[in-house]
Regions:
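Membrane-embedded alpha-helical bundles of multi-pass transporters/translocases
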Residues: 1-199
């Protein structure tokens, strides 16, 4: 999901949200869209203490889904998309800052049961997955836009991308998140219920 978002954001800012190399759309998209993470450093702990990490993360993914839906209302409207990105990022605060803590708890539990630490193995697996997914997402994205008729800009001409290319870019940047966030929230809730039964 994040890999598809990263692969398509440059194209989304250039061909859907703004105009080619306008110099500000991508900066606004990242700077304003990710700004709540700065405040999130302070807010995350009280929220997670009040709700619990699992509930805070599940609720955050639901809020992130709402933010993505705001973006999908009008994917070419800069103000609306920025508002949606802010809501999405606020929703992602618990997962952004708590996922490492939860991984640490899981590693401690593995050590308690097996008497062995597996930090190195888990780090290696995570790095492999991140690297592979980045490459796979870029391949899927480039294949998709090339098959749908993407026209690269030249020194003399800045083309207008057809609707199919624009819709594919929107799907990669926003649509994939809209599909994933509710599923992740449900998985988080299911994991919490399973954890309660095991205790």
């Amino acid at each position: 999901m994040n890999a598809m978002f990263s692969a398509g954001t440059f194209y989304y800012c250039n061909w859907v949200l703004g105009s080619y190399n306008d110099g500000y759309t991508q900066a606004l998209f990242y700077a304003l869209g990710q700004a709540p993470l700065g405040i999130g450093i302070v807010l995350c702990r009280p929220i997670c203490n009040k709700l619990g990490r699992g509930r805070a993360m599940a609720g955050g993914f639901v809020l992130a889904f709402a933010g993505v839906l705001i973006c999908l209302l009008s994917p070419g409207n800069l103000a609306l998309v920025l508002a949606g990105q802010v809501v999405r990022t606020i929703g992602l605060i618990p997962s952004t800052f708590m996922i490492s803590s939860m991984l640490g708890d899981a590693l401690d539990e593995v050590e308690q049961v097996s008497k062995k630490r597996c930090d190195g193995f888990s780090s290696s697996v995570m790095n492999c997955i991140t690297t592979l997914m980045g490459g796979i997402a870029l391949c899927i994205f480039n294949f998709g836009i090339s098959q749908l008729g993407y026209q690269a800009p030249t020194e003399t001409m800045i083309p207008v991308q057809n609707d199919a290319v624009q819709n594919f870019i929107i799907f990669c940047v926003i649509g994939v998140q809209a599909l994933c966030y509710p599923v992740i929230a449900l998985l988080q809730l299911a994991a919490m219920k399973k954890g309660k039964k095991m205790v």
